[in-house]
From Swiss-Prot:
<feature type="binding site">
    <location>
        <position position="7"/>
    </location>
    <ligand>
        <name>Mg(2+) 1</name>
    </ligand>
</feature>
<keyword id="KW-0255">Endonuclease</keyword>
<comment type="function">
    <text>The RuvA-RuvB-RuvC complex processes Holliday junction (HJ) DNA during genetic recombination and DNA repair. Endonuclease that resolves HJ intermediates. Cleaves cruciform DNA by making single-stranded nicks across the HJ at symmetrical positions within the homologous arms, yielding a 5'-phosphate and a 3'-hydroxyl group; requires a central core of homology in the junction. The consensus cleavage sequence is 5'-(A/T)TT(C/G)-3'. Cleavage occurs on the 3'-side of the TT dinucleotide at the point of strand exchange.</text>
</comment>
<keyword id="KW-0540">Nuclease</keyword>
<dbReference type="GO" id="GO:0006310">
    <property type="term" value="P:DNA recombination"/>
</dbReference>
<dbReference type="GO" id="GO:0008821">
    <property type="term" value="F:crossover junction DNA endonuclease activity"/>
</dbReference>
<keyword id="KW-0378">Hydrolase</keyword>
<dbReference type="GO" id="GO:0003677">
    <property type="term" value="F:DNA binding"/>
</dbReference>
<comment type="subunit">
    <text>Homodimer which binds Holliday junction (HJ) DNA. The HJ becomes 2-fold symmetrical on binding to RuvC with unstacked arms; it has a different conformation from HJ DNA in complex with RuvA. In the full resolvosome a probable DNA-RuvA(4)-RuvB(12)-RuvC(2) complex forms which resolves the HJ.</text>
</comment>
<feature type="binding site">
    <location>
        <position position="138"/>
    </location>
    <ligand>
        <name>Mg(2+) 1</name>
    </ligand>
</feature>
<keyword id="KW-0227">DNA damage</keyword>
<comment type="similarity">
    <text>Belongs to the RuvC family.</text>
</comment>
<dbReference type="InterPro" id="IPR020563">
    <property type="entry name" value="X-over_junc_endoDNase_Mg_BS"/>
</dbReference>
<keyword id="KW-0238">DNA-binding</keyword>
<keyword id="KW-0460">Magnesium</keyword>
<feature type="active site">
    <location>
        <position position="66"/>
    </location>
</feature>
<feature type="active site">
    <location>
        <position position="138"/>
    </location>
</feature>
């Protein structure tokens, strides 16, 4: 299975592509989609086109993207949400199922600690994919998103989806884990 991970951003959107066979992960590609200094619609179009090109070039089977977090600056949050929307439109237009994960879920799945630093993410991604060096921060987050989906993402989604039924039994999902 091939997974495309996306770390959305208005100026720079990171991408990472990995192959998954059982528990084995293999690096395929990573990098960034940079938008020009232009009006918002042009930048969003660049993100959409970039994601569409990635799908044509790498033919992924699934995609994973980071959920938007609420920033202290509401304007920044809105712009990030629009960039994320452009990326999701590109993914869906390419026929991919799209999974969404929070930054906390991403870091927990890749590093084992939800408050991991950018450097810790870069190092762990490099180790998990046997890279000779650390990828850039945006590419590392995108590769991490793909790794999160490959390893624990499906479990996190399943637990989240059955949370109402678990609550009736006195159980709940906390930080991606089942607790009583």
């Amino acid at each position: 299975m091939r997974i495309l991970g996306i770390d959305p951003g208005l100026r720079v959107t990171g991408f990472g592509v990995i192959d998954v066979s059982g528990h084995q992960l293999a690096y395929v590609a990573s990098g960034v989609i940079k938008t020009p200094t232009a009006d918002l619609p042009t930048r969003l179009g660049t993100i959409y086109d970039g994601v569409s090109t990635l799908i044509r070039e790498h033919t992924p089977d699934q995609a994973a993207i980071e959920k938007v977090f609420v920033n202290v600056n509401p304007q920044s949050t809105l712009l990030l949400g629009q960039a994320r929307g452009a990326a999701i439109c590109g993914l869906v237009s390419g026929g991919l199922p799209v999974a969404e994960y929070t930054a906390l879920q991403l870091k927990q799945a890749v590093v084992g600690y939800g408050r991991a630093t950018k450097e810790q993410m870069q190092e762990m991604v490099a180790q998990l994919l046997s890279l000779s060096g650390r990828p850039g921060t945006d590419a590392a987050d995108a590769l991490g998103m793909a790794i999160c989906h490959a390893h624990g993402g499906n479990t996190l989604n399943t637990l989240g989806g059955i949370a109402p039924a678990l609550a009736k039994k006195g159980l709940r999902v906390r930080r991606g884990r089942l607790v009583g």
